[in-house]
Amino acid sequence: MLKYSKLAIITALSMTLLAGCFGPKPEEELYVAFENAAKQEKTMFEDAKKLEALEKEGQELYNQIVQEGKDNNQTVKEKLNQAAKNTTEREKVLTKEKEALNKAQEEVKSADKYVKKIEDNKLKDQADKVKSTYEKRHDSFNKMYDSYNKSLKQEKELYTMLQ
C-alpha cells in the first residue's frame, strides 16, 4: 500500500511538471499577438487607397470651384456641397484607420507579457524591436491623424465660408 501511494505521488508530481512543458510557449503566444495586430490592420491598405481617391476627388472639386467661381456662382454651390461631403467621407475613412490601428496597438501591448517570458536574448531583442516599431508607427499615425483632421476641419470651414 505504501509503495502504491509513493507511485501515485510521483506520478502526480510528474504530471504537474510535464503540464508546464506542454502549454503554449511565450514565443508562440507572442507570434499570435503580433498576428492579431496584423489582422487588425488588414483593412488599412484599402482604406488608404480609398482616402487617396477621395483626396484626388477633393482636389478636382477644389480646382473646379476656383475655375467656375470666376464665371458662375450657381454651379459652384453644388460643387461646394460635393466638396464638403468629400471632406466628411475622408474624415470617416481616417477615423476607421485610426480605430484599426488602435486595435492593433492593443494587441501589441498584450504581447509585452510574452516578450518578458522569452528566455532567448536574441529572440527577445527581435521581439522588442518589432514591438518598438509598432509603437513608433502608432505614434506617427496619431501625429498624422491630428494634422490631417485639422486640415479637414479647415477645408470644411473654407467651403462653408464660400457658400
Language-model-detected regions and their locations in the chain:
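Classic N-terminal secretory signal peptides
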Residues: 12-13
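C-terminal motif of bacterial Sec signal peptides marking the signal peptidase cleavage site
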Residues: 16-20
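Immediate post-signal-peptide N-terminus of mature secreted/exported proteins
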Residues: 22-95
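Bacterial N-terminal signal peptides that target proteins for export
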Residues: 1-8
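Extended amphipathic alpha-helical interaction segments
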Residues: 76, 90-163
